[in-house]
A protein has these predicted regions:
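A structural signal for short hydrophobic beta-strand segments in well-ordered beta-sheet cores
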Residues: 74-76, 138, 237, 345
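Anion-binding (especially nucleotide phosphate/pyrophosphate-binding) glycine-rich loop
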Residues: 1-128
């Protein structure tokens, strides 16, 4: 039932990586259950591919099964909508505009799928997907039972949820790069015990024209500031919560601070903007820029001069090129500012 030696690099936005030993696209929950059951029978490692917009496939490919849940439906009733995990965020946003449903204006131009957005609690402009989530339905890959959770049981955090944190025993091998020994992190893995099937969103009725205008503004913002002319995986690093910076901080004004690394005169002080994401953070892009890394390249990959928190595939980059730049950024930022950046991108 699986496709063999699948050119998986054709699906993620980076367009990088070797083949998957097996690939399967599930059109509904029953197909997904059968695929998981078959993978377990064959003792295959597997990971779940959504839109692939924050994913880096290794140069060697993936030795197990890549599962793509293409569960595509939108069913609405009043101000609520039940949405399949495979629905693209752009499709859901367009739906909300057409129906005059407010709540996702901030996500205009956000790539990826609903499942991926919920899993990683996607957010920007001080808003997060959790703000409108009512409930989430998932598949337990151990028991093959469907689980439905209310919002309060989904464990949403900064770019995380119970679905990204695992919630149980390992079943797949998608992992944050920060956990891999190759980048100097822990040698443990984060597993996905559950696969998101669908989510119910609670909107508020609004003016369709105003909602559409707000969405268009966010799309134009992204087009103007993000290096979308090159294959990329969006933000590589999470923004840095102000509360986690080990430094003496001087407030210059409401939106700007001066950071003085604590008890280490060899570290550099710097002035930085502060934004709500949704709590006070220093943008990772600004820190990378202050470290003098804009435009630095390795192989076919480059730290974008346009937005330094993007590492772009400028010319047939390898996964190893991307990983080398990620490691370089982490080391330079730590050495210069005593700040540890944490990856948002996922490796498989």
């Amino acid at each position: 039932m699986f496709q063999e030696n699948f050119p998986i690099h054709t699906l993620p936005s980076y367009k990088i990586g070797g083949p998957a030993r097996y690939f399967f696209e599930a059109k509904n929950p029953d197909e997904l259950k059968r695929a998981v059951e078959e993978a377990k029978k064959r003792n295959l490692e597997f990971f779940v591919l959504g839109g692939g917009t924050n994913l880096l496939i290794g140069d060697e490919g993936f030795p197990g099964l890549v599962l793509k849940p293409s569960i595509n439906f939108i069913e609405s009733s009043g101000e609520e909508a039940s949405v399949g995990a495979g629905v693209s965020m752009s499709a859901l946003i367009n739906f909300s505009v057409e129906r005059g449903l407010s709540g996702l204006e901030w996500a205009g131009g956000l790539p990826g799928t609903v499942g991926g957005a919920v899993r990683g609690n996607a957010g920007c402009f001080g808003r997060e997907i959790k703000d409108i989530v009512k409930s989430v339905k998932s598949l337990d890959t151990e028991t093959l039972r469907e689980i439905e959770r209310d919002f309060s049981d989904c464990g949403f955090g900064y770019r995380s949820s119970i679905f990204s944190a695992g919630g149980g025993s390992p079943s797949s091998v998608a992992e944050p790069l920060r956990r891999t020994g190759a980048l100097g992190g822990k040698n443990s893995r984060i597993y996905n015990k559950e696969i998101i099937l669908s989510a119910v969103f609670s909107f508020k009725k609004g003016d369709a024209k105003e909602i559409g205008k707000s969405v268009s503004e966010k799309i134009l913002y992204r087009l103007g500031r993000h290096p979308l002319e090159y294959p990329n995986a969006g933000s590589i690093f999470k923004n840095v919560p102000l509360s986690q910076i080990n430094a003496d901080i001087t407030q210059i004004n409401a939106d700007t601070i001066r950071v003085h690394p604590r008890n280490n005169p060899r570290k550099s002080a710097f002035t930085a903007p502060v934004k709500l994401d949704p709590f006070p953070v220093v943008p990772a892009a600004y820190i990378i820029s202050e470290a003098g890394l804009k435009g630095v390249s390795i192989g076919g990959a480059m730290i974008s001069p346009k937005h330094p928190n993007f590492i772009v595939n400028v010319f047939e980059a390898k996964s190893s090129d991307i990983k080398s730049l990620i490691n370089l950024v982490k080391v330079e930022v730590k050495n210069k500012f005593d700040i540890e950046l944490e990856e948002e991108i996922i490796a498989a």
